Each structure stands twice: as structure tokens, then as C-alpha cells.
């Protein structure tokens, strides 16, 4: 049985406390050094929407940390460029718990943040981006100036050894799948791209098959070992 998530508050790099859930990997030798993955929600969402995937990661032998980014859920503050620091602080937290390698999995805005922040932390070895948002359309959707002007291309196309997985639903009504196809086509190896027929902007997040595929991608590239439930 997967244990109940641990509720924690993690100080972001500017001091803002981030509400988050942490799920440990199963029992067995080397639990402390098991890989860890930060799971990032999209705009207007919150951590509870992604507990199902966090449980899958824990079952696959990885730490899972799901935060409420600033301006979302139980975390205060305004949604601004400090979200980059939020992600890095969550990665630092898993590092402090002893995770040997780190990964990211983000959906929509969380996918954008995963792609942008991956090169900023030395222990990130893999990421999964589901229907990743682009800066300009996200700003238009929010209806005000989008504070994160980081271009995706330089971060995504780096030949830095980080494994980048891209999943996108062809029926996405918010972010065109062609955006992700273009990003992935020029990304360095190792990488993986899957364009799913049908679906919508949120359909891949909770699809059991996609969850299994993305958890396996992360486990393979982070060196996770399946563990007995706690």
C-alpha cells in the first residue's frame, strides 16, 4: 500500500513557503538514495491533482514531490518569475533527502517550467513535459503580462545529457501539438517524443497508459529500482 503523502512547507529561494506533498519510494536497501522527481502542475491547478502520478512514481522506486507553486493552491504570493526559484527549491529539497538523481515531470505551464529549469540544477538527469505551454500563448491566456520570458529553445536544445521526454495530445485545444513536435525535433539525445491521437490539453495527465510510459521513462533514465510497498 502506498503511504499517505507527507505534508511539508519548503522555503523557496526567496523565502516564500511552498506547500507540498512528498511521497517516499518503497522499502528496501538504498531508499535514501533513490531518485527523486518533482511533479509540476499547470496554470490554475494545484498539487492534489497530481497525487495519482506521484503514487505511481513512488511505486516505481522514486521519491515524488508535488508542490503548489506560488499563487496556486495553499501557497501564497503572486504568480511571477519566482516560480523558477520554487522549482529549484523543490529539487534542492529532494537533494537534501539524499536522492541520487533528480527529474521533473510537468504538465502545460509545469511542462514549460520543467524544460526551462532542468539545465539550472546540476543533479537533474531527466524530465517529462506533457503538452508544454509556450510563453506567449500562456501570457495571452492569463490575460496579463506573463512574467517568465525565458525562451524554451535554448534550454530544450542543449546537449547536456539530460533525457527529455515529450508527450502531447493531437487534440489539444490550448497548445498546438506542432509546437512540441518542433521543440522535440531539435532536442539532443537522449529524447523521446509521442504525439497521441485525440485527447485534449489535460487528458494525458491521468491516462493510466501515459502515466506508466512516463514513469518508466523517468525510472530508466534516473536509475530507479522497483521497491516493495511500505
Model-derived regions, located:
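N-terminal cap/lid segment of alpha/beta-hydrolase-fold proteins
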Residues: 1-29
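The serine-hydrolase catalytic nucleophile loop
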Residues: 43-55, 178
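Alpha/beta-hydrolase active-site loop
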Residues: 49, 78-97
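Conserved alpha/beta-hydrolase
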Residues: 57-74
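Primarily recognizes the serine-hydrolase "nucleophile elbow" in alpha/beta-hydrolase
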Residues: 90-150
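Short beta-strand/loop motif that positions the catalytic acidic residue
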Residues: 159-161, 166-168, 172
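Short alpha-helix in the alpha/beta-hydrolase fold that links the catalytic acid
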Residues: 176-185
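Catalytic histidine-centered segment of alpha/beta-hydrolase-like enzymes
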Residues: 199-209
